[in-house]
């Protein structure tokens, strides 16, 4: 399979991209020269931008301008933004997931943009962080090695986290919006449960699960388009994760 990439827009660039000419220049500089050789699947305008930060106000305008520049060049790249699980509250059971009161007014116009452009919402889903923050969560549940379902019908933490985001989308009337998992990973050292063995188990099982077509309880029978994060999760440890994950790139694991 050809490698497909998610291209991130640097956080410090977001404000300038609210100017349409700057967005056109950005596409001309970073996308157009490489478009024949690189398969850009998505452009992520902002990665884990929180609603109460200064740059949040620039996201939708920057997305719109980048999309217009992309469309004018007849590229088929989809423009989105990547959220993380901190924008979701009441995430267990997953069916109760909703956007936080801060996140809802931020995300709703973005959702409308995505729906109108046929683009998915990008979401970074890290069972590791949930496990590290609450070690009453069984490690096997986080690593896809638990046998049988838990009391709300879930066999693994990844599905539960993903479905809580789907529930939040349903709650704001966006039940048809697809989620693409733009990052997922497990560290090989540096924290509770972080080891080469656990990382290897997580990646192997995630790849198997995402490509199986089983889907999640809320979205059964679908492959889960998922990209692996290619660096250690700890920002001060830059070693490459095990498996053949290319440093600093997200690699697709679904066709």
UniProtKB/Swiss-Prot annotation:
Enzyme Commission no: 3.2.1.39
Active-site residues (renumbered): 48, 183
Pfam families: Glyco_hydro_17
GO MF term (any one): glucan endo-1,3-beta-D-glucosidase activity
PROSITE patterns: GLYCOSYL_HYDROL_F17
InterPro entries xref list: Glyco_hydro_17, Glyco_hydro_17_plant, Glycoside_hydrolase_SF
Gene3D superfamilies cross-referenced by the UniProt entry: Glycosidases
Catalytic activity reported: Hydrolysis of (1->3)-beta-D-glucosidic linkages in (1->3)-beta-D-glucans
Range of residues in the leader sequence: none
Keywords: Glycosidase, Hydrolase
GO terms of biological process kind: carbohydrate metabolic process
UniProt record similarity statement: Belongs to the glycosyl hydrolase 17 family.
Protein name: Glucan endo-1,3-beta-glucosidase
Source species: Glycine max (Soybean)
